[in-house]
Amino acid sequence: LNAQIAVADARIAAFAKDDPIATRLTTAPGVGPVTASAFVAAIDDITRFRTAHELEAYLGLIPCERSSGEKRQLGHITKAGNGRMRWLLVEAAWTILRSKSPDTAALRAWSLQIAQRRGKRIAVVALARRLAGILYAMWRDDVVYDAHRIRPRLQAAPPRAA
């Protein structure tokens, strides 16, 4: 079994190395050959999505909404779409949180701020959604990951009106 796993890993790594999109996506933090290859296979054509939000919805990473009148309540993620891709993005988010690299500092700080308010598991899923948006932009704009382009919302949220 270990030999078969090694062969499969080698094939995935070879695909990621040969595919220019997958190679570019592996420059993002937490994204290795398996996640990049799976993302390319799951999405196929990035032009199907006009915005990163559409891609995040396709992957089931956006919260479901229950609205009534002017009251808007966000719930758990929808879990629509490819569950394995969603799982890979969540695992990549955990990798980012554990990383001490300066390239991940802004993403970690943003996620930890959410964790203080909502809990670590919700923060990890939010980071996975953010990572999906980053991968979308990298693919769409044909660029490699640049930590300086990440603009986290680190300022404190304004107090809510009662």
Residue locations for each model-derived region?
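A detector of single, family-specific signature residues
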Residues: 1-162
